[in-house]
Amino acid sequence: MTKINIILHEPEIPQNTGNIARTCAATGAALHIIRPMGFEIDDKKLKRAGLDYGHQLDITYYDDLADFNAKHPNACIYYFSTKAPRAYTEISYGGDNVYLMFGKETRGLPEELLHDHPDTTVRIPMRDKLRSLNLSNSVAIAVYEVLRQHAFEGLREDGELTRFSWNEG
């Protein structure tokens, strides 16, 4: 089974990080947060947005990008940026571990990082003259593309009605 790893590089907005944590809990993805952050981890907004799922969340913090790289030296990372040369759908996300990195809300990922990884830098297409999508929305789009490519492995396949049955005519 493929393990999805979401990497947030210096996130700034607690609500976004909380929503991303909730997406990770719902999909079984691991969350990696690279400091510095623009908020304290006990921020009420962060908890309200998603960290009440903390018991179902695999989360790790790193002092900086060098710390992350030292602990994951062989990670194949896909860098998400509005500046990328190709769409995220042009990639086949294979392997046992898939790492998806997203930058801070105000500036994205450092350009030198993108420049050093042209083959694994991707974007989510959107209309011209818009700066970017919301970070938590971008993460959800990317996570579900990886899951789709792996036939939603490990996720519940059907839903249930509370007052009715799908089998009733």
Predicted segments, located by residue:
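Post-transcriptional modification and biogenesis factors for structured RNAs
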Residues: 1-169
